[in-house]
Curated annotation (Swiss-Prot):
Heterooligomer composed of large and small subunits. This is Exodeoxyribonuclease 7 small subunit. It comes from Bacillus licheniformis (strain ATCC 14580 / DSM 13 / JCM 2505 / CCUG 7422 / NBRC 12200 / NCIMB 9375 / NCTC 10341 / NRRL NRS-1264 / Gibson 46). Belongs to the XseB family. One of its GO terms (cellular component) is cytosol. GO terms for biological process: DNA catabolic process. It is an enzyme of class 3 (hydrolase). Bidirectionally degrades single-stranded DNA into large acid-insoluble oligonucleotides, which are then degraded further into small acid-soluble oligonucleotides. GO terms for molecular function: exodeoxyribonuclease VII activity. It catalyses: Exonucleolytic cleavage in either 5'- to 3'- or 3'- to 5'-direction to yield nucleoside 5'-phosphates.
Amino acid sequence: MAEENKTNRDDLTFEEAMKGLEQIVSKLEEGDVPLEKAIDYFQEGMALSKICHEKLQNVEKQMDFILRENGELAPFSVREEEKGDR
């Protein structure tokens, strides 16, 4: 059954994983959760957190590239204005 949950988690979108993580945090913040159940929630929360982190890293990698005028992918970097550039 744990393997089934792992498979189901892999199919989650970022938003679904975040919602699940928020629900777990809410349950744990209530404080009336038995220790064994709290550990289960914590483990599930860590798995959801990992999914969110991996999805964010993937998006970050995608955003490192933008299309050039000729259609090739190029690294993208944001240059902050320096004080003297005004």
